[in-house]
Amino acid sequence: MALTQEAKNQIIKEYARHNGDTGSVEVQVAVLTADINELNNHMSENKHDFSSQRGLMKKIGHRRNLLRYLRDIDVARYRTLISKLGLRR
């Protein structure tokens, strides 16, 4: 259910701002989006898994806060990221 290390490394490589970057807002949002997508698939099959549902809501809230922060500090990076990830905003 969780992302494999290979998938996470691929996401980090794609969204990193420089070599060795694992903590930038873009990388964090991209990894959270992949986690959220996997949890959404899990929840569609397991509707009564309430602990996973709570984890999904926490991840969505964390991503929302990171996106709000990015929008406040740099609108161009924010718009690039949401278009690249295909998020509605």
From Swiss-Prot:
Gene3D superfamilies named in the record: 6.10.250.3130, S15/NS1, RNA-binding
GO biological process, alphabetically ordered: translation
Entry-linked SMART domains: Ribosomal_S15
A Pfam entry, by short name: Ribosomal_S15
GO cellular component, one term: cytosolic small ribosomal subunit
SUPFAM superfamilies: S15/NS1 RNA-binding domain (SSF47060)
GO terms assigned for molecular function: rRNA binding; structural constituent of ribosome
Annotated InterPro entries: Ribosomal_uS15, Ribosomal_uS15_bac-type, uS15_NS1_RNA-bd_sf
Keywords: Ribonucleoprotein, Ribosomal protein, RNA-binding, rRNA-binding
Family from the record: Belongs to the universal ribosomal protein uS15 family.
Entries under HAMAP family matching the protein: Ribosomal_uS15_B (MF_01343_B)
Subunit structure: Part of the 30S ribosomal subunit. Forms a bridge to the 50S subunit in the 70S ribosome, contacting the 23S rRNA.
Function recorded in the entry: One of the primary rRNA binding proteins, it binds directly to 16S rRNA where it helps nucleate assembly of the platform of the 30S subunit by binding and bridging several RNA helices of the 16S rRNA. Forms an intersubunit bridge (bridge B4) with the 23S rRNA of the 50S subunit in the ribosome.
Protein name per its UniProtKB record: Small ribosomal subunit protein uS15
The organism of origin for this protein: Oenococcus oeni (strain ATCC BAA-331 / PSU-1)
